[in-house]
Each structure stands twice: as C-alpha cells, then as structure tokens.
Amino acid sequence: MAVPKKKMSHSKSNSRKSNWKRKVIKKINFAVTLGKSLSFGKLSKFYLDD
C-alpha cells in the first residue's frame, strides 16, 4: 500500500536548492569562459574535434 512521504523541512529544501544552484552557476561560468576563449581565438587550452 502506498505511504505518503514525510514533509521536507524548509531548511533542508533550501539547502538542496542552494547546492543545485551553486553547481549550475559553476557550469554556466565555465561555459561562458569557454565561449569567450573560443570567440577570441585562444584555443591553446582546449582540444576541439574538427
């Protein structure tokens, strides 16, 4: 028989959301940095398949 889940506390859900957002921001910063380096022609640090 199905049992309802326990309610997650606000602090726990907020900490999970902030952890997720921190990971997303890190990936966004990496993507922006990679895009800038590719647009300015600094390809020495990256290997691209042609």
From Swiss-Prot:
A biological process term (GO) from this entry: translation
The major lineage groups are: Eukaryota, Discoba, Euglenozoa, Euglenida, Spirocuta
Q: Name one GO cellular component term.
A: large ribosomal subunit
What's the main place this protein lives?
A: plastid
Instruction: State its location(s).
Output: Plastid
Q: What is this protein called?
A: Large ribosomal subunit protein bL32c
Family that this chain belongs to: Belongs to the bacterial ribosomal protein bL32 family.
Could you tell me which SUPFAM superfamilies the record lists for this protein? Zn-binding ribosomal proteins
Q: Which gene encodes it?
A: rpl32
Q: Which GO terms describe its molecular function?
A: structural constituent of ribosome
